[in-house]
Swiss-Prot record:
Specifically expressed in reproductive organs and seeds. The gene is PBRP2. Disruption phenotype: No visible phenotype under normal growth conditions, but embryos of mutant plants display a reduced rate of endosperm proliferation during the syncytial phase of endosperm development. GO terms for molecular function: TBP-class protein binding; zinc ion binding. A zinc finger (TFIIB-type) spans 2-34. It comes from Arabidopsis thaliana. This is Plant-specific TFIIB-related protein 2. The keyword Transcription applies.
Length: 336
């Protein structure tokens, strides 16, 4: 409880904090001054080592979860029983439980935690920023999660950690030479770091390829909603555009998602008799130059009958209107 000035009472009163609901309440009039307060500090927990609570001591909960660990660093820890501790279970039972837990716990995560500690040691020795440390840990996590690469104990682990730090430095444009990194890498030479750096490069390229394919679909879906909203496109066209974008993914159209989407918006709107959008307006909204949209339309024209939904327009209308606009572009180009 603390004393503040209530907005309703207009006088200093005791404010009560209800931790269950997160509300701050005036003790005089009951006015809720603040609602749904979020407590960002760590929770207080109480742990006792015996039944009589003689040495009960509050302790903070551990650190935040680690996003680079599969478990998020949420683990169960069973300690060996203390000589003075008393419990419902006997010491033999607790010892048995302790041994069983050690047999089933995830030793792979112990190894990656060891790698994170090694990276922390290296970045501290090189006086590197926490951003480098975080990126190097992310690289090691991807290395361990890749199908063809796994962490190994010993010198190889140190080489992987050193290569991850080196890669992170290059990505973030911080100058640390292989010689400097090798000096803090516990016996790992520059040749080993260079070798593991090449492996890491392949792992990251593989990961980027798999991510970009899924992100392209997600980003295109978001772009469809945003572009259609800005262009004030009718509901019928809004239904046709995402369907056309999805069908276009089945063809070898070597254009980035924005260019493909801009071209499809132009094609769909141009087929429409009532809601045509100028290519210049589409280009401004999509942040794509007009010539790029025109070239994308030309690339997609051979597949137009399979891309444009048949419920939106018949084949003759699609061919007639798109062929007409492409012919006009070519004529204007030759006449210049």
């Amino acid at each position: 409880m603390e004393e503040e000035t209530c907005l309703d009472c207009k006088r200093p009163t005791i404010m009560v904090v209800d931790h269950s609901s997160g509300d701050t309440i005036c003790s005089e009039c009951g006015l809720v001054l603040e609602a749904h307060i979020i407590e960002y500090s760590q929770e207080w927990r109480t742990f006792a080592s015996d039944d009589n609570h003689s040495d009960r001591d509050p302790n903070r909960v551990g650190a935040a979860t680690n996003p680079f660990l599969k478990s998020g660093d949420l683990v169960t820890i069973i300690e060996k029983p203390k000589e003075t501790a008393s419990s419902v279970l006997s010491k033999d039972d607790i010892s048995t439980l302790f041994r069983a837990h050690n047999q089933v716990k995830n030793h792979e995560e112990d190894l990656i935690k060891q790698a994170f500690e090694e990276i922390q040691r290296m970045t501290d020795a090189l006086d590197l920023d926490i951003v480098i440390n975080s990126r190097a840990c992310e690289i090691v996590s991807k290395y361990d999660g890749h199908a063809n690469t796994k962490l190994r104990r010993g010198k190889k682990l140190n080489a992987i950690c050193a290569a991850s730090v080196s890669t992170a430095c290059r990505e973030l444009q911080l100058s640390r030479t292989l010689k400097e990194i090798a000096e803090v890498a516990n016996g790992v030479d520059k040749k080993d770091i260079r070798k593991e750096s090449l492996v890491i490069k392949r792992v990251l390229e593989s990961h980027q390829t798999s991510v970009s394919a899924s992100q392209a679909i997600i980003n295109t879906g978001e772009l469809v909603r945003r572009f259609c909203s800005k262009l004030d496109i009718s509901q019928r066209e809004i239904m046709a555009i995402p369907e056309a974008v999805e069908k276009a993914e089945n063809f070898d159209i070597r254009r980035n998602p924005k260019s493909v989407l801009a071209a499809i918006i132009f094609m769909i709107s141009h087929i429409s008799q009532t809601n045509r959008k100028p290519i210049r307006e589409i280009g401004i909204v999509a942040e794509v130059v007009e010539n790029t949209i025109k070239n994308s339309v030309k690339d997609m024209y051979p597949y137009a009958l399979k891309i444009i939904p048949n419920w939106y327009a018949c084949e003759s209308d699609i061919i007639k209107r798109l062929d007409g606009v492409i012919t006009s572009w070519d004529s204007a180009k030759f006449s210049v």
